[in-house]
C-alpha cells in the first residue's frame, strides 16, 4: 500500500492523478468532440480571406471605348463612388463592354455591399443611354479569381447556337442556383438570334435606308398587353399574331411598297438563324465549343461548391441530346484535395517521427506510449474548437497542426522526464507523479503562455495577410493550450499507473548502448560548458555576433510575398497587333493552341477570342492551360511556362503572357503576369506621354521580365467628320448619322423574340462581304427632309485615326497597369526597389501618381509591418515572462536566445534558395516561441536550486544545464522532426509548406548548439549585474 504524499503536493495535477476514471472520461470526451469536429469541418486550400467583390457588366454592342466610358462607365462610377465601405473601384471600357469591379473593405458583409450596388445602379438608370439593350448586371464574384471548374460543351451534330441555347436554359441556370456559385459564364458567344444582313446596294437602288428597315422590323415584332373582354357571362383574353419567331417569317416581312408592289425583307437582305454576336468564339483543345466557367462567390467554400456541381452534372447532362458532350476540363478542387492530403500525410509523418524520438530517448515502451497518446489527443481535440470558430481544414491549419506536433509533445516529455527521475531515485509511482507534476507545473504554464504570447501579434496583423494567418495562429494556440491541459492531467495520471522502477530499469542491449551514448554526450557537454563559463566574455561576443549577423542577413536576404504555387492550371493572355480583326485573331489563336497542345505536360486547353466581360479587345485572347497531375509530368509549372513561351515565340505576330493560378487572389483584374504597377493621371494625354517612357526603362531592368502594359492607343478608328452645315441644309442631324452607322456596323439588337423558355434577339447589320474595310462606309445612305436618299460621302469625310482600344479607370481617373514577372535569380523585393528607383529618375509630374497593386501592394504592406510584428512578439513574450517570474532580468536572459534562431533560419533559407516571404516569417516568429524553451527549463531549475538548496548561481546553472540537457535535446529534436516533413515536402502545394519547414529546421539546429552555452553565461552576467545594482542601492540608502 502506497503512502500518499501530503495534499499540498501535486499542484493542479493532484485532482486528476487521484481520480483516474474521471480523467480518462474527460480525455475521451475531448477525443470524441475532436473526431466529430473533424468530420464537420469543410476543406479548402486556404482560409477564406476574400475581399467582398462585385463585378458590374454593361454591354452596348457597337459602342466605341470612348462612348462606353462617357455614356455608361462614368455615370455608374459616380454613383458607386458614393458607397460607404468601398475600398477600390476599377473599370475597363472597351468596344461594346463596360466592366466595373468594386472591392469593399474586409469588414463589410457581401450582402450589404450587394444592396448598395443595386441601389447605385437604380440611381444611375436615368443617366444611361436609352437604347441600351440590357441594364447593367452585377455578379458577386472577383473577376481575377480563377474559375473553380471549367466545362466544355461540344457537339458533332448540332450547331453551336442550339448547343448554347440548351446549355444556358438547362445547365447554366441550374448551376447558378447552387450555394457558393457567384457567376457562370458561357464563352463562345453562340447565343441564338435572327441576323438580318442588309444589301446596301439593293436598298439604295430602291430608295430605302437602313433606318427604314429597322423601323419596319421593330414595328412588326411586338409582344405587349392587349387587354380582355368582360361580357355578361364570359371573359375573353385578347391575343394576336404580333410575334415573328423564325428567320423565314422575317424574310416575308413587307418593309415598303414601290409602284404598288411589296418589297419584302428577303428582297434586300439575307435573313438567317445565327449567333447574336458573330465576333465571339471559344475552343476546347482544337474543337469549337461552348466553354462554361464557374466562379465562386467571395468567401464561399470551393470544395463543397464543386462537390455540389459534380453531384448535379449527371442529372443535367441527361436532359441534353446524346450528340452533346459535356466534359470537365479543369477542377481546382482536385489539386486542393491533393495538397490537403499531402499535408495530412506530412502531419502523420511528423507524429511518427516525434514518437520515434521519444522512444529513442526514453527507451521504454510504457514511457513512450504516454506522450504517444498525448500528441494525437491534443491535435484531435483542436478540431472541436476549429468547428466552433468556423475554421476549415486547409493547408495553413494543417501546417499549424504539423508544427504543433513538435510543440505539444514538449510538455508531456518534460512531465514524464521529471516523474521518471523521481521513480528512478526510489519514489513510488504515485508519489513520484504527484511530486514531479507539482514541481514541473509552473514550468509547463510558463512554456505554454509564453509560446501563446508569441502568436498574439499574428492576430493583429492588418488587411488580408492578417486574416490569412488568423486561423493558423489560433489553431496552433489551441493545440498548445490543449497540450498543456493534457500534460497536467492525463500525462501524470498515466505515469502514476504505467511507470515503475522495474519498467524503467528494464533494459535491453539497445537501451544500454544508447544510455552509455547519452552519458558520454552529457559528460562532453559538461566539460564544454565548464570551459565556456570560464571564458564568459568570449561567449558573450559570440552571442553579440549572432545578433549582428541576424540583422545583416535580414537586410540582404531576398524577400518575397507568397510562394508561387503549382496548382496545375496556367492562365494566359495572347496579344496581337492592335488592328487585328476577330477573324485574324481566331486564326492566330488556333496556331498557338496547336503549339501548346504538343507539350507533354499539357492535358487540355480552353481559349476564347472576342470582347466580353473578361476580354477587353479583339486583339487579345484568353487561354486556360490545364496541366497533367504533378505525378504524371516531369516539370513543375514554372518550367512548363518557360518551355511554352519559348515554343510560342516561334509563332509570328503574337505575344504570349502566362502565369500559374494561385489559391490566394488579391487582384481584382485579370492580369497578364503575376505582379502589377499602375500609373494614374487626370487625363489620357498625360498617360500617353509618360507610359512609353516608363515602359522603355522598365523593360531594360534585369530584375523584371515579361514587362507589358494594357495601354493600347494604336487602335484603328474611321473618324466620320460630318459637315454639319451641309447636313443641316438637307435636314439631316447627327442622330440620323449615328443611327445609320449603328444599323450598318454595330450588330444592332433591334427587336426581341419572346418564347416560353428564353428571349432571343434580332440583329441588324450590313452585309460587308463584298465591300470590306473603309469601302463599306460608301454604301451608307441617309434620308433627307424631302424624302430623298443622300449618300454619307456627300456630307462627311472619312479620316483614319488612332485611338485607345480600351479606357481603364481606377477610382474614376484614367489609369494604366504595367504588368511584370520576376526572373528566377531575383526576388520580388529586388523588383519593387528597381521600379521605385526607376520612377525617381523620370521626375514624373505631380498629376501622375504611381502605386503597386494586388500581390505587390500586399507585399509592401507585409514587409513594412514584419519588423514591428517581430518586435511585438518579443515584447509580448517579455511581458508574459516578466509577470510569471516577477523579474525584469530573467525574461531578458530567456530572450537572449532569439538571435541564434534568426541566424539559423535565415541561413537555411539562403542555402535552400528560398525567399523570406510571409510563410518563412511565420516560421521565424514560431522559432521565437520554441528556442526560449531551452532557457526557461534551465533557468527554472537554476532558480529552484539557488532557492531550495542554497547553491551558488554558477553551480545552480551548471547543474540545471546538465540536469535538463536530455529533455532540452529531446524537445528540440521533437520540434525539429515535426518541421522536417514540411521541409522535405515534394507533393502538391509543397511550395507553400517548404519555407516554413526550412526556416524552422535551420533555426532549431543553430539555436540548439549555441543556446546550450550562451544562456548559462548570460544568466550569470545578469546575476552579477543584479548583485551590483543591489549593492549600489544599498550603499545609497546607507549614505542617506
Curated annotation (Swiss-Prot):
Keywords: Cell inner membrane, Cell membrane, Membrane, Transmembrane, Transmembrane helix, Transport
InterPro entries in UniProt: AcrB_DN_DC_subdom, Acrflvin-R, Multidrug-R_MdtB
Primary localization class, coarse: membrane
Bilayer-spanning residue ranges: 16-36, 347-367, 369-389, 396-416, 440-460, 472-492, 537-557, 863-883, 888-908, 911-931, 968-988, 998-1018
Cell compartments where the protein resides: Cell inner membrane
Subunit structure: Part of a tripartite efflux system composed of MdtA, MdtB and MdtC. MdtB forms a heteromultimer with MdtC.
Family the UniProt entry places it in: Belongs to the resistance-nodulation-cell division (RND) (TC 2.A.6) family. MdtB subfamily.
Name this protein carries in UniProt: Multidrug resistance protein MdtB
Lineage: Bacteria, Pseudomonadati, Pseudomonadota, Gammaproteobacteria, Enterobacterales
Amino acid at each position: 500500500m502506497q503512502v500518499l504524499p501530503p495534499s499540498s503536493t501535486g499542484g493542479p495535477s493532484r485532482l486528476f492523478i487521484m481520480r483516474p476514471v474521471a480523467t480518462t472520461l474527460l480525455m475521451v470526451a475531448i477525443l470524441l468532440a475532436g473526431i466529430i469536429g473533424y468530420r464537420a469541418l469543410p476543406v479548402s486550400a486556404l482560409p477564406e480571406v476574400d475581399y467582398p467583390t462585385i463585378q458590374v457588366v454593361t454591354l452596348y454592342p457597337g459602342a466605341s471605348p470612348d462612348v462606353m466610358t462617357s455614356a455608361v462607365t462614368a455615370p455608374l462610377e459616380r454613383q458607386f463612388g458614393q458607397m460607404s465601405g468601398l475600398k477600390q473601384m476599377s473599370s475597363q471600357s472597351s468596344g461594346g463592354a463596360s466592366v466595373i469591379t468594386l472591392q469593399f473593405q474586409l469588414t463589410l458583409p457581401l450582402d450589404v455591399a450587394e444592396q448598395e450596388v443595386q441601389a447605385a445602379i437604380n440611381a444611375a438608370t436615368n443617366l444611361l443611354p436609352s437604347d441600351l439593350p440590357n441594364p447593367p448586371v452585377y455578379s458577386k464574384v472577383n473577376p481575377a479569381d480563377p474559375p473553380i471548374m471549367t466545362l466544355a460543351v461540344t457537339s458533332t451534330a448540332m450547331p453551336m447556337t442550339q448547343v448554347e441555347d440548351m446549355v444556358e436554359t438547362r445547365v447554366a441556370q441550374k448551376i447558378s442556383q447552387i450555394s457558393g456559385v457567384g457567376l457562370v459564364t458561357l464563352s463562345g458567344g453562340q447565343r441564338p438570334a435572327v441576323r438580318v444582313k442588309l444589301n446596301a446596294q439593293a436598298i439604295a437602288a430602291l430608295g430605302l435606308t437602313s433606318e427604314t428597315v429597322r423601323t419596319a422590323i421593330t414595328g412588326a415584332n411586338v409582344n405587349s398587353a392587349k387587354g380582355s373582354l368582360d361580357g355578361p357571362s364570359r371573359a375573353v383574353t385578347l391575343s394576336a399574331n404580333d410575334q415573328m419567331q423564325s428567320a423565314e417569317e422575317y424574310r416575308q416581312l413587307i418593309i415598303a411598297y414601290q409602284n404598288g408592289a411589296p418589297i419584302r425583307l428577303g428582297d434586300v437582305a439575307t435573313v438567317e438563324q445565327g449567333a447574336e454576336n458573330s465576333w465571339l468564339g471559344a475552343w476546347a483543345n482544337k474543337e469549337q465549343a461552348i466553354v462554361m466557367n464557374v466562379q465562386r462567390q467571395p468567401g464561399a467554400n470551393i470544395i463543397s461548391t464543386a462537390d455540389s456541381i459534380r453531384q448535379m452534372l449527371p442529372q443535367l447532362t441527361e436532359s441534353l441530346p446524346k450528340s452533346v458532350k459535356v466534359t470537365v476540363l479543369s477542377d481546382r478542387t482536385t489539386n486542393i484535395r491533393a495538397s490537403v492530403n499531402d499535408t495530412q500525410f506530412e502531419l502523420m509523418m511528423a507524429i511518427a517521427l516525434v514518437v520515434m524520438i521519444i522512444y529513442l530517448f526514453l527507451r521504454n515502451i510504457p514511457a513512450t506510449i504516454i506522450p504517444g497518446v498525448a500528441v494525437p489527443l491534443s491535435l484531435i481535440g483542436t478540431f472541436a474548437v476549429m468547428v466552433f470558430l468556423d475554421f476549415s481544414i486547409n493547408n495553413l491549419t494543417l501546417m499549424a497542426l504539423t508544427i504543433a506536433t513538435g510543440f505539444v509533445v514538449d510538455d508531456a516529455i518534460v512531465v514524464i522526464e521529471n516523474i521518471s527521475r523521481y521513480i528512478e531515485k526510489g519514489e513510488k509511482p504515485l508519489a513520484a507523479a504527484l511530486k514531479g507534476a507539482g514541481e514541473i507545473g509552473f514550468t509547463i504554464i510558463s512554456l505554454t503562455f509564453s509560446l501563446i504570447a508569441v502568436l498574439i501579434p499574428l492576430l493583429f496583423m492588418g488587411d488580408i495577410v492578417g486574416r490569412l494567418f488568423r486561423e493558423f495562429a489560433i489553431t496552433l494556440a489551441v493545440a498548445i493550450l490543449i497540450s498543456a491541459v493534457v500534460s497536467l492531467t492525463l500525462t501524470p495520471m498515466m505515469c502514476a499507473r504505467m511507470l515503475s522502477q522495474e519498467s524503467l530499469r528494464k533494459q535491453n542491449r539497445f537501451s544500454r548502448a544508447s544510455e552509455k551514448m547519452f552519458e558520454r554526450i552529457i559528460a562532453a557537454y559538461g566539460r564544454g560548458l565548464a570551459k565556456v563559463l570560464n571564458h564568459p566574455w568570449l561567449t558573450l561576443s559570440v552571442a553579440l555576433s549572432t545578433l549582428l549577423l541576424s540583422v545583416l542577413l535580414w537586410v540582404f536576404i531576398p524577400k518575397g510575398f507568397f510562394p508561387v504555387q503549382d496548382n496545375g492550371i496556367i492562365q494566359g493572355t495572347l496579344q496581337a497587333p492592335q488592328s487585328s480583326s476577330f477573324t485574324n485573331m481566331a486564326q492566330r489563336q488556333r496556331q498557338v493552341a496547336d503549339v501548346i497542345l504538343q507539350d507533354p505536360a499539357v492535358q487540355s486547353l480552353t481559349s476564347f477570342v472576342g470582347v466580353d466581360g473578361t476580354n477587353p479587345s479583339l486583339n487579345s485572347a484568353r487561354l486556360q492551360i490545364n496541366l497533367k497531375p504533378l505525378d504524371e509530368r516531369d516539370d513543375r509549372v514554372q518550367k512548363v511556362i518557360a518551355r511554352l513561351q519559348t515554343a510560342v515565340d516561334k509563332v509570328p505576330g503574337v505575344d504570349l503572357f502566362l502565369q500559374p493560378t494561385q489559391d490566394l487572389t488579391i487582384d481584382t483584374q485579370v492580369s497578364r503576369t503575376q505582379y502589377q504597377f499602375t500609373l494614374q493621371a487626370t487625363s489620357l494625354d498625360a498617360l500617353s506621354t509618360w507610359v512609353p517612357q516608363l515602359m522603355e526603362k522598365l523593360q531594360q531592368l534585369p530584375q523584371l521580365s515579361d514587362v507589358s502594359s494594357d495601354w493600347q492607343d494604336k487602335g484603328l478608328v474611321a473618324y466620320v467628320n460630318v459637315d454639319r452645315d451641309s447636313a443641316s441644309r438637307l435636314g439631316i442631324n447627327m442622330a440620323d448619322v449615328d443611327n445609320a452607322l449603328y444599323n450598318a456596323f454595330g450588330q444592332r439588337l433591334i427587336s426581341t423574340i419572346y418564347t416560353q423558355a428564353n428571349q432571343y434577339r434580332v440583329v441588324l447589320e450590313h452585309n460587308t462581304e463584298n465591300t470590306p474595310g473603309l469601302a463599306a462606309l460608301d454604301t451608307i445612305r441617309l434620308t433627307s427632309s424631302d424624302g430623298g436618299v443622300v449618300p454619307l460621302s456627300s456630307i462627311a469625310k472619312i479620316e483614319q485615326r488612332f485611338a485607345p482600344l480600351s479606357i481603364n479607370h481606377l477610382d474614376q481617373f484614367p489609369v494604366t497597369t504595367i504588368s511584370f514577372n520576376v526572373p528566377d535569380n531575383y526576388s520580388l523585393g529586388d523588383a519593387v526597389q528597381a521600379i521605385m528607383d526607376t520612377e525617381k529618375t523620370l521626375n514624373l509630374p505631380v498629376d501622375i501618381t504611381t502605386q503597386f497593386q494586388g500581390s505587390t501592394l500586399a507585399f509592401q504592406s507585409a514587409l513594412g509591418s514584419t519588423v514591428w510584428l517581430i518586435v511585438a512578439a518579443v515584447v509580448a513574450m517579455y511581458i508574459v515572462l516578466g509577470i510569471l517570474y516577477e523579474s525584469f532580468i530573467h525574461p531578458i536572459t530567456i530572450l537572449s536566445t532569439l538571435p541564434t534562431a534568426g541566424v539559423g533560419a535565415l541561413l537555411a533559407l539562403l542555402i535552400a534558395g528560398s525567399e523570406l516571404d510571409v510563410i518563412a516569417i511565420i516560421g521565424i516568429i514560431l522559432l521565437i516561441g520554441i528556442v526560449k524553451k531551452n532557457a526557461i527549463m534551465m533557468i527554472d531549475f537554476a532558480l529552484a536550486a539557488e532557492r531550495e538548496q542554497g547553491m551558488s548561481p554558477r553551480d545552480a546553472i551548471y547543474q540545471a544545464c546538465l540536469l535538463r540537457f536530455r529533455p532540452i535535446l529531446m524537445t528540440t529534436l521533437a520540434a525539429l522532426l515535426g518541421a522536417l516533413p514540411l521541409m522535405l515536402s515534394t507533393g502538391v502545394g509543397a511550395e507553400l509548406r517548404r519555407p516554413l519547414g526550412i526556416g524552422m529546421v535551420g533555426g532549431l539546429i543553430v539555436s540548439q548548439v549555441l543556446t546550450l552555452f550562451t544562456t548559462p553565461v548570460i544568466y550569470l552576467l545578469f546575476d552579477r549585474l543584479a548583485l551590483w545594482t543591489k549593492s549600489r542601492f544599498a550603499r545609497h540608502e546607507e549614505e542617506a
